Structures are given as C-alpha cells and as structure tokens.
C-alpha cells in the first residue's frame, strides 16, 4: 500500500473540509438574506445520531439516514416538520424529486479524479466539492452514468464527509486496501456523513457494509 499517498489523501480531504467550513462562515456574514423559501432543497445524508425533524431511512443502513434541508445564511439548515409539510404538500417524494434536480446540475459540473495503482489501473475515483448538494448526487442517474465506463453498473460508494465521495468498482479486495484510510477520513470530518459502504445501481442505493469492521 502506498502510505505516503494515503497520508496525502487524508490531508487533502481535511483541507477540503476546512475550505467547506470557511465558505459557510463567509456566507453567514453576507448582508443579503437568503430565504428558506427560495433556496433549493437539499437531500442530506448524515449519521443517524444527528438530530433533525424530517428523516427517512436508507435501505439496510444501520448508522446513516436521509434528512431534509436547504442552504441558508449559516450553511445547511434542516426543515422543521411543519415547514416541510407546508412546502411539500405531497410529502417526501416531492421533496426528493426537487432536491435531486439540484443535485443533478451539481454533479454535471464536477470532474472526478481517478486514483491509479503503479500499473496504471484505476483503483477508485475521488470527488471533492464544497457544494452541499454534491453528496445527494449519488442518487441520480447522472452519477451512475459518470462512472459506468470505468466501473460498470454496480458502484461501491463511500461518503466520509460532506465534501468527499469515493467511488470504486464492486470488489472486497480493492476496498480492503483502503478501508482504514477511508474510515479515518470519516473520523476526522468536520461534517461527517457515513462510515458505511453503499451499493449503487439502477435499482437504487443501499448499505452493504461498515468501514469500521475488520477487513476480511
């Protein structure tokens, strides 16, 4: 394993997280207010222990849930239950549809970095973005299309923090190589998302494993 590269990856992820936090702090000082009513909805993916009023379970996930939010003056805000009911009369399905429209436009503007081994074979892809909608883009067709040529139809995805998405072709051996480093990214995160591993394909997204469990 290339430990110097993994150290670089952890530092790079930390700087991206700090940049994300700094951007949110700068937005909070703007004099122009951004109303919740005019802000695009954000499908948040977050640790289960974080509290919010509007939550939806992720299939087979034990530590991660969906939540409903939007971008406000101080960063990502959660919808209160009553606010959510007033804004989305048709419920979660309406909210998710609108949130993914925004996420689709975000993923279209992102170029992944492909990490390769010494022979030039792609190990995994890295996405870094300070846009809070980037994480929910994993639920879009455009996200799957972006990686289909290199990784096929079944994607394994890790989302350690709000600024980072790691994507690889389904395969236990490849994941085991980087499992410890990916889990450390989750532990070091200012805005953690998930310690779980997700399978994404045309059928949807669901959890298939946990980065904390020992490699096999």
Residue ranges and their predicted role:
Residues 1-6:
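Bacterial N-terminal signal peptides that target proteins for export
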Residues 134-148:
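Short amphipathic alpha-helix segments
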Residues 156-160:
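Short beta-strand
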Residues 163-169:
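Short cationic amphipathic helices and targeting signals
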Residues 23-132:
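Charged, alpha-helical interface segments at or near domain boundaries
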Residues 145-146, 153-155:
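Generic recognition of flexible, low-complexity loop/linker segments
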Residues 169-216:
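C-terminal structured domains
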């Amino acid at each position: 394993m290339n430990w110097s590269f993994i150290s670089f990856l952890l530092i790079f992820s930390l700087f991206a997280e700090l940049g994300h936090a700094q951007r949110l702090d700068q937005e909070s000082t703007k004099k122009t207010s951004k109303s919740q009513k005019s802000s695009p909805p954000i499908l948040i993916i977050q640790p289960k222990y974080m509290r919010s009023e509007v939550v939806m379970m992720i299939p087979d996930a034990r530590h991660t849930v969906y939540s409903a939010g939007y971008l406000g003056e101080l960063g990502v805000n959660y919808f209160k239950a009553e606010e959510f009911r007033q804004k989305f009369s048709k419920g979660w399905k309406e909210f998710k549809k609108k949130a993914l429209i925004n996420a689709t436009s975000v993923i279209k503007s992102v170029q992944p970095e492909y990490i390769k081994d010494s022979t030039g074979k792609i190990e995994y892809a890295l996405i870094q973005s300070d846009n809070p909608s980037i994480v929910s883009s994993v639920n879009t067709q455009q996200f799957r299309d972006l990686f289909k040529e290199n990784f096929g139809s079944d994607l394994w995805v890790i989302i350690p923090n709000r600024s980072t998405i790691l994507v690889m072709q389904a395969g236990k051996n490849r994941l085991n190589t980087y499992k410890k480093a990916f889990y450390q990214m989750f532990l070091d995160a200012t805005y953690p998302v998930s310690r779980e591993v997700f399978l994404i394909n045309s059928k949807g997204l669901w959890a298939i494993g946990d980065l904390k469990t020992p490699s096999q």
